[in-house]
Design a protein with these regions (language model features):
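Extended, helix-rich architectural segments
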Residues: 1-225
Length: 226
């Protein structure tokens, strides 16, 4: 498939997903207004840092309850003071040396990934728990950052569109968001079209609408184990 055809296909799928999700947006906007007003907008767009975000909150019960739920999930599932996961080799009884190696790997993962500020895990996972309590779902993203530790982010549900497979499992996520020309250059470098490179040189903060599509390969062979 030619790149232009692939782009056209992605745009068509995004438009279909936007239409499919539209009936839920009014309810999610209500959840934002009354339960999680800091999170952002689905339908009623407001300026960043707007002081009117909390205008509809006439009772703080729901926002406080959601904060308590998120804190409880954080403390029970991913407590920063505990080793909340372990490693093992399926079907293998570990020797003493294997157990020591696995435990040292767990310690390294906690120290260099999950409990270090540069990975953003602690902040991102708390945002995920806030979204789970507010909307019933959330989008947690793990990204490779060359030369740095793995990075974590929780994307705003308003930017994301999902699709289920035949088993009812989400296997496709589309994210529609904005990047400045400067950010695009930082991310993709010289492979960008000359037009965007020129804009970045003159107006680095000009924004572009971007689409991040994660979906199964069309030529995937399900009979292969890998």
């Amino acid at each position: 498939m030619k790149p232009e055809e692939q782009v056209g296909q992605i745009v068509q799928r995004l438009e279909a997903l936007e239409s499919y999700r539209a009936p839920w947006e009014s309810m999610w906007q209500d959840c934002t207004d009354y339960v999680n007003p800091r999170r952002g907008d689905f339908k009623a767009k407001q300026a960043r840092g707007s002081a009117t975000r909390f205008d509809k909150v006439f009772d703080s019960t729901a926002p406080l309850a959601n904060e308590q739920l998120a804190s409880g999930l954080h403390g029970h599932l991913t407590n920063t003071a505990e080793r909340w996961f372990s490693l093992r080799v399926p079907g293998v009884e570990p020797t003493d040396s294997m157990s020591r190696w696995l435990q040292s790997t767990v310690d390294m993962m906690f120290e260099r990934t999950f409990n270090v500020a540069s990975s953003n895990f602690i902040t991102a996972v708390h945002e995920l728990y806030m979204d789970l309590g507010s909307y019933g779902t959330g989008v947690f993203f793990t990204e490779d950052r060359p030369g740095k530790s793995i990075g974590f982010r929780t994307f705003h549900l308003a930017d994301c569109f999902v699709m289920e497979n035949h088993e009812g499992v989400i296997d496709t996520v589309y994210r529609k968001y904005k990047h400045t020309a400067r950010q695009l250059v930082q991310l993709y470098g010289p492979v960008l079209p000359k037009k965007i490179m020129d804009i970045a040189a003159k107006s680095p903060f000009q924004e572009f609408t971007c689409v991040h599509a994660v979906e199964p390969r069309a030529d995937l062979n399900y009979d292969k184990k890998d």
